[in-house]
C-alpha cells in the first residue's frame, strides 16, 4: 500500500529540538533541510545531525533530506552522507532541478530516489523532459519562493495567479505517474490563507503539500484526504459500472448521471488518495 504525501513537514536539520518534534508529529513525511534553512557556516553541523536523525528515526519514520544543489560546494558531502544512511532514508529532495540527467546522477550518488524541486523558469520550461528521468524520480514540488524570484513576481501563492504553472507541473507529473506536491504557504499564522491556497491545488489534483509549521499539518491532511462522503460516492460509482459490465453495458445510470470508464478512473483516484 502506498503511503501518500499529503502533509510533508520541512524542518531545518540544524535544530535538534525542532527535528525531534517533527519526528513525533502527524506528518506523512519529514524533510530535513540542509539547503535554504541552514546558514553556510552551519552546513557541516546540519549534515552531521541529519545523519544522526535518519539513523535514529529512519527505520520507523519516512524521512527525506533536502540537499544543497549539485553545483554547490556542499553537494559532495551532502550526497556522501545520504549514501551512508540510504538504507534508512526514503528519498533525497534535489533543489532547482532543470534536467532529468541531474536527477539520475544524484540518485546514483545517494542510492535513493529523488524528489525534484521545480523552482526556476528553466525548470518549468523543461518540466516535461524532467519527468522522463524514470524510476529515480518519485515526486515534483513547486518551490514558490525561488520561482517567484526568478520570474519577478511575489513569492506568496495566490491560487489562480499560479494556475498555468501549477497545471504544467501537474500534467507533466501525471503523464509519468509522478506525485505532484504543492510548495509551502509562506505565512505561518494564516490558516485561512493556507486553506484557500491548498483547497485550490487539491481541486486541481495535487497529491499534497509541504508545510513549514506543525500547526498547518491538520489542515493539510484534511484538505488532501477525501471525505467519507467522497469515498462512499467513489465506491458507488465503481460498483455501479461493475454491475453494468455484468449486464453487458459499457455505461450505466447512477443518481440520474451516466457512469462510464472515465468516471471510474476518477473514482479510483479518490479511493487511492483516501487509502492509508
Located regions from the model:
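Expand to "…catalyze enediolate/carbanion chemistry for C-C bond making/breaking, isomerization
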Residues: 1-276
